[in-house]
């Protein structure tokens, strides 16, 4: 499957040109933003780690080996890109133990920048945001047009698609999920099960969002929508009054789409009709998610791009800096600007 089939239409028209991303690790930098005051004592050793060309799971395995502990005692908030320069937190549970010598874990691809103790382990999804610095090289596009589109995006946000990274190479993860769903089976390995269930939910969400981008309603509240704030997992129904809430205009409040699980869509009106129609069209995937014990959740349809800035270090380089909530994809912003020329591996998760 191609990008259009896995995601959906762009919000702001055709790509404005072409560029390369991830020609080097420095072209895709991610800094995890953690809003947790660390106590300095406790049985959990917290590590601020810089990784280059190394995914989060391999870094965790390396830290576990160096510390002489089982992998399950190593925790992290989110998955970060392999083909990138990333900085993120890990924690290791060490009850009654001194800080281990972790030098064996470090080399050119992994450096421990600082460490401290805390009373609790690092939970998945505990980070507040991810900060990105992207360098688009070999840029072939009109900079005036790029600037105009970036200004619009800064004001209006972008569709909050799950990026192609979620679906694997050419959508292979989705094919696997469909196969398991058809057999009414679940993968035995926990990591594979989690990956494929996430793929199925993400695809159903993207189909709903694609339909609303196509009809222009992705950034507008309509009666029957379920609304949520940018950083909140809770939601509430939209009536006539809620559809004119001023917080919609300033990108604090957004319509949401389904993360399918048990039950029908809790939305109403045209929103529920669309969501249930897509779920019925993909009934095997939806029923598979229900049998797996997934609960119905919501995800904002519109993604505000926090602290977006850009400049051109050279005539053929565009550098972007911005902040996204956890679970949102930097490559979806790039997609609203340009087409990417193939450079290295790009199909790996950028955020959890």
Curated annotation (Swiss-Prot):
One of its GO terms (molecular function) is RNA binding. SUPFAM superfamilies: Pseudouridine synthase. InterPro entries: PsdUridine_synth_cat_dom_sf (IPR020103), PsdUridine_synth_TruD (IPR001656), PsdUridine_synth_TruD_CS (IPR020119), PsdUridine_synth_TruD_insert (IPR011760), TruD_catalytic (IPR042214), TruD_insert_sf (IPR043165), TruD_pseudoU_synthase (IPR050170). One of its GO terms (cellular component) is cytosol. Disulfide bonds: none annotated. The active site is at 81 (nucleophile). Keywords: Isomerase, tRNA processing. Its EC number is 5.4.99.27. One of its GO terms (biological process) is tRNA pseudouridine synthesis. It holds the Pfam family TruD. This is tRNA pseudouridine synthase D. The lineage of its organism: Bacteria, Pseudomonadati, Pseudomonadota, Gammaproteobacteria, Pseudomonadales.
């Amino acid at each position: 499957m191609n990008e259009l089939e896995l995601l959906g239409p762009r919000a702001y028209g055709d790509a404005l040109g072409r560029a390369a991303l991830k020609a080097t690790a420095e072209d895709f930098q991610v800094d995890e933003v953690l809003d947790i005051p660390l106590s300095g004592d406790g049985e959990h050793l917290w590590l601020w780690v810089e990784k280059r060309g190394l995914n989060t799971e391999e870094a965790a395995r390396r830290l576990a080996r160096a510390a002489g502990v089982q992998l399950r005692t190593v925790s992290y908030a989110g998955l970060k890109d392999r083909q990138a320069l990333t900085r993120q937190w890990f924690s290791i549970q060490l009850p009654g133990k001194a800080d281990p010598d972790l030098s064996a874990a470090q080399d050119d691809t992994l450096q421990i920048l600082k460490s401290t103790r805390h009373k609790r382990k690092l939970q998945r999804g505990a980070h507040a945001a991810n900060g990105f610095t992207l360098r688009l090289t070999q840029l072939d596009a009109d900079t005036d047009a790029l600037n105009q589109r970036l200004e619009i995006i800064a004001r209006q946000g972008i569709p909050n698609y799950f990026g192609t990274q979620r679906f694997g190479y050419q959508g292979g993860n989705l094919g696997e999920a469909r196969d398991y769903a058809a057999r009414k089976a679940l993968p035995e390995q926990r990591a594979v099960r989690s990956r494929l269930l996430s793929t199925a939910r993400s695809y159903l969400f993207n189909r709903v969002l694609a339909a609303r981008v196509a009809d222009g309603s992705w950034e507008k509240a309509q009666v029957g929508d379920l609304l949520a704030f940018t950083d909140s997992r809770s939601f509430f129904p939209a009536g006539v009054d809620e559809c004119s809430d001023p917080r919609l205009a300033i990108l604090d409040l957004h319509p949401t789409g389904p993360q399918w699980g048990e039950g029908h869509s809790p939305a109403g009106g045209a929103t529920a009709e669309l969501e249930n129609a897509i779920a019925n069209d993909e009934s095997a995937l939806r029923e598979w998610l229900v049998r797996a014990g997934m609960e119905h959740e919501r995800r904002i349809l519109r993604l505000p791009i926090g602290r977006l800035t850009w400049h051109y270090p050279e005539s053929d380089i565009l550098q972007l800096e911005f902040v996204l909530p956890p679970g949102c994809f930097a490559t979806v912003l790039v997609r609203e600007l340009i087409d990417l020329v193939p450079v290295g591996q790009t199909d790996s998760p950028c955020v959890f």
